[in-house]
Amino acid sequence: MPSFDIVSELELFEVNHAVQNTQKEIATRFDFRGHDVSIELNEKNKEIKISTESDFQCEQVYNMLENHFYKRKIDVQALDPQKATASGKNFVQVIKLKDGLDSDTAKKINKAIKESGIKVQSSIQGDKIRVTDKKRDTLQQVMAFLREQQFGLPLQFNNFKD
């Protein structure tokens, strides 16, 4: 019976490349010369830390990071920016990375599938949702339906079986 899995995975090596490209752009931009501006990725905690001298520079670096995410085809919904806080003479902004389906989001997705009226079976299996049906076309309808919805994090469809 055809099935597929709905997951929300983040490729950390792509995120790392986006952060490195942002670091290179910071080094070459004229408006950041002579200023203490840095961005670093903590893969263990899955967060990005921006440190600048002003709140405005913090916003600029965040926008640069978003642009590099777009260029690397990483969904920016995976970013969860926290409020920039002042620590000493620097502003620090922590951006948490959303990776994996939490149980609340999985329940919302499962409920949306059931309320859509598409006759499929969906079940939550840990950090993924398995959707099964007799026809591939019905599964593709579910995929199209979910792409239209906004759940606050990027969704991928994998493990498609016939």
From Swiss-Prot:
One GO cellular component term: cytosol
InterPro entries tied to this protein: DUF520, UPF0234-like_C, UPF0234_N, YajQ-like_sf
Its biological purpose: Nucleotide-binding protein.
Domain of life: Bacteria
TM region positions: none
Entry GO MF terms: nucleotide binding
Name the record gives this protein: Nucleotide-binding protein ABAYE0515
Gene3D superfamilies in UniProt: 3.30.70.860, YajQ-like, domain 2
